Amino acid sequence: MAKEKFVRSKPHLNVGTIGHIDHGKTTLTAAITKYLSLFGRADYTPYEQIDKAPEEKERGITINIAHIEYETEKRHYAHIDCPGHADYIKNMITGAAQMDGAILVVAATDGPMPQTREHVLLARQVNVPAMIVFINKTDMVDDEELVDLVEMEVRELLNKYEFPGDDLPVIRGSALKAVEASNDPNDEAYAPIKELLDTMDEYFPEPQRETDKPFLMPVEDVFSITGRGTVVTGRIERGVIRPGDEVEIVGMSYEVNKTVVTSVEMFRKILDEGLAGDNVGCLLRGIDKDEVERGQVLAKPGSITPHTTFKAQVYVLKKEEGGRHTPFQKGYKPQFFIRTADVTGELIEFPAGVEMVMPGDNVEMTIKLIYPVAIEEGMRFAIREGGRTVGAGVVTAIVE
């Protein structure tokens, strides 16, 4: 089948199902595609197909992620579902597939379980903007009061992790009943699926487009062009850059250099503007080649500052994933790959009661770099040692 052109007529959102193993995340994903396929807005993707998700590599880490797409009357969705618990952790920390909204699936038969909590904590740490709860398997619980109890527990859990637990939408239903339902879209088994989709359309906020955010471009390379000046190249991470725009060069020291971009070029052609996602060269006014280097960023003035010390949620690779074979303690000094920067840092603090971190752990820690780098909350990074990736992290708070 030929690749269809992606038509941007509707707002696009990235969403995903999260929750404890066997609570029905994948069945719910299948049910959504089945229901929408009756209107020609999705290809029905059965459980087995989603479950054997292909492998992807992100920051040197292998993750299994299934990408499903569908649309409602109002929106276009890219939906991710991960087969294994570790895949969810790795996905959320590396940001392989970021979420504009999450659907937390909780089985009425079990209530919130350990992985439910871990996924909610991660959603908070990586700032998933909104959450909807789907209480699944309600057909297997005879007593409605038990479902009320599960709902109460889930709302309490969400409050604990600073989601609006008292106010956010909770939908009850059976994903399996919808998957097994007839091809009549009015079949009552589809009612909770329709309710979920309507709620997603209304409740998940529309994400800010990358081009509307303040300009930022990590510096990949620096050239000196005789008679013209210094050109830095890189891929624009967010925002827009136009000739004449003032930018700051941030990172490597606490001092921030200001300059003006006098020309933006792509494939040797002069551009009116460079947009998020473009690989460009920016000519900088009055900057010598030795005043800017790989690892720094060009950014809209005042939009990002250099820091050395931050808190992060880190996933430590298992031996089987190519990670370390042994645990590490405070004082461990690996390399941190932050955008294009490659900088040594020290692990200076673990949570209370944690003496050492084992391969396979998912843990919060405080990191101190040997020199300042442009850092912000929600930013992803890799931890490497001796040429191999040993961990992946996301910045949860700036310390200094």
Curated annotation (Swiss-Prot):
InterPro entries: EF-Tu_GTP-bd, EF-Tu_GTPase, EFTu-like_2, EFTU_2, G_TR_CS, P-loop_NTPase, Small_GTP-bd, T_Tr_GTP-bd_dom. Disulfide bonds: none annotated. PROSITE patterns: G_TR_1, G_TR_2. Residues 10-208 form the tr-type G domain. GO terms for cellular component: cytosol. Residues 19-26 are annotated as: G1. Its EC number is 3.6.5.3. Keywords: Cytoplasm, Elongation factor, GTP-binding, Hydrolase, Magnesium, Metal-binding, Nucleotide-binding, Protein biosynthesis. Belongs to the TRAFAC class translation factor GTPase superfamily. Classic translation factor GTPase family. EF-Tu/EF-1A subfamily. Monomer. This is Elongation factor Tu.
